[in-house]
Amino acid sequence: MTLWINGDWVTGQGERRVKTNPVNGEVLWQGSDADATQVAEAGRAARAAFPTWARLPFAARQAIVEKFAALLEVHKAELTAIIARETGKPCWEAATEVTAMINKIAISVKAYHARTGEQQSELPDGAATLRHRPHGVLAVFGPYNFPGHLPNGHIVPALLAGNTLIFKPSELTPWTGEAVMKLWQQAGLPPGVLNLVQGGRETGQALSALDALDGLLFTGSANTGYQLHRQLSGQPEKILALEMGGNNPLIIENPEDIDAAVHLTIQSAFVTAGQRCTCARRLLVKRGEQGDAFLARLLEVSQRLTPGEWDDEPQPFIGGLISEPAARHVYEAWQRLEAMGGRTLLAPRMLKAGTSLLTPGIIEMTGVKQVPDDEVFGPLLSVWRYERFDEAIRMANNTRFGLSCGLVSPDRKQFDQLLLEARAGIVNWNKPLTGAASTAPFGGVGASGNHRPSAWYAADYCAWPMASLESPTLVLPDSLSPGLDFSREEPV
């Protein structure tokens, strides 16, 4: 029984699914997808649970969410192993994901009060009050790269605001989704407040088509995000938050410490085997001896990166990709770039047939025309050389995406220029592109999102504002508008 609907664990009636470790093939999870009838049942359960959940005092909802955080702490080692085994990422990185899930709770409580709390201002004859109300029933579509943390970034603020939810994890990470739901169950969520439906495209289409939905919160690829946007077109009454990917540029401009710049670049491009939406995909390096020295050192260090299994000792920097087909897709993308005229600096290698272990690849594309503006979700970095900083900014902005952009430079004036001209939601200076703070918004423009950033701003799309003019008494104004006559006729 792998679906959680209205407080009960039930067996899916859809397609049978088996999840294996992407590196060693170990069977980890078996279950069946939710069919359309079960998705509709989850919608009805969430709708029925909404009035009571929304009317609970905030402190009562907060207490349940904080109990969930405490359970995450208790089960940290267990959940770390589940995430690592299911995604292929090393144990050390899976542990940081669980820590981020725990920290998200307190941050979300603060964000709720800061972004969507209650405010009142006095007026001469009363008061103006701002309150926030939950939307109702929201669907959450989770990604596979951070199967615990990223859905958590939608679920926690949505529950705090008083919404009820239907969560569909990625079909590539059903085990993590199930494990997290069991912790929510232990935390004492009332039946129907949070429902779990497993499945792939058919389940997702049934969920996004539900009339019961008041909104949909999505993290994933631009292609799927655009499909959801089209599906919900003509329904402005439904909130849609799209957090999508990027073709992110990192500019290297005369670094003072080459090893530090190489470290930052590797953290930006290859952490999580390149499977972060903010990962650097395009490396813009200034021409000259310093740029040449930087690239030589980058190649030297990058070729030592050998992916390993989640529990290898010593622990590897990167593990496998989410699946063998995903690794093959990245490898074939490198082959296509090379066929277009790219010059391979470091060739990626599939380490073992039938597994997702792929070494990083670096290819120079300077001067190559009509390079596809695609997000290749893996450890593949293209290099572009430039002469002037203005040229680097134009190259950085030459994408339909707009998620993250970074600059490595000792010159603050260059960063100030980048801040003014960059078209991206995240613009970093001498920090990895993959670094993000939950105390700041997280999201992009263009094909990277629809202006609904998450993290600190997630509270904004989890509630709508209600404005009130209030007075405890009703009296006739001393001064009336022209044309109004409230005089009383004397009786005859």
Swiss-Prot record:
State which Enzyme Commission number(s) the record gives: 1.2.1.71
Residues the entry annotates as binding NAD(+):
G220, S221, A222, N223, T224, G225
PROSITE patterns according to UniProt = ALDEHYDE_DEHYDR_CYS, ALDEHYDE_DEHYDR_GLU
The active site of this protein is located at E243, C277
Record's superkingdom?
Answer: Bacteria
User: Mind telling me which NCBIfam families this protein's record contains?
Assistant: arg_catab_astD (TIGR03240), PRK09457.1 (NF006992)
Role noted for this protein: Catalyzes the NAD-dependent reduction of succinylglutamate semialdehyde into succinylglutamate.
Q: Which reaction does it catalyse?
A: N-succinyl-L-glutamate 5-semialdehyde + NAD(+) + H2O = N-succinyl-L-glutamate + NADH + 2 H(+)
In alphabetical order, the GO MF annotations are: succinylglutamate-semialdehyde dehydrogenase activity
Q: Which GO terms describe its biological process?
A: arginine catabolic process to glutamate; arginine catabolic process to succinate
InterPro entries hit by this protein: Ald_DH/histidinol_DH, Ald_DH_C, Ald_DH_CS_CYS, Ald_DH_CS_GLU, Ald_DH_N, Aldehyde_DH_dom, SuccinylGlu_semiald_DH_AstD
Q: Which UniProt keywords apply?
A: Arginine metabolism, NAD, Oxidoreductase
Give the family per the record.
Answer: Belongs to the aldehyde dehydrogenase family. AstD subfamily.
Full protein name: N-succinylglutamate 5-semialdehyde dehydrogenase
User: Pfam families this protein is in?
Assistant: Aldedh
Q: What class of enzyme is it?
A: oxidoreductase
Pathway stated in the Swiss-Prot or TrEMBL entry: Amino-acid degradation; L-arginine degradation via AST pathway; L-glutamate and succinate from L-arginine: step 4/5
HAMAP family attached to this UniProt entry: Aldedh_AstD (MF_01174)
Tagged with keyword NAD: yes
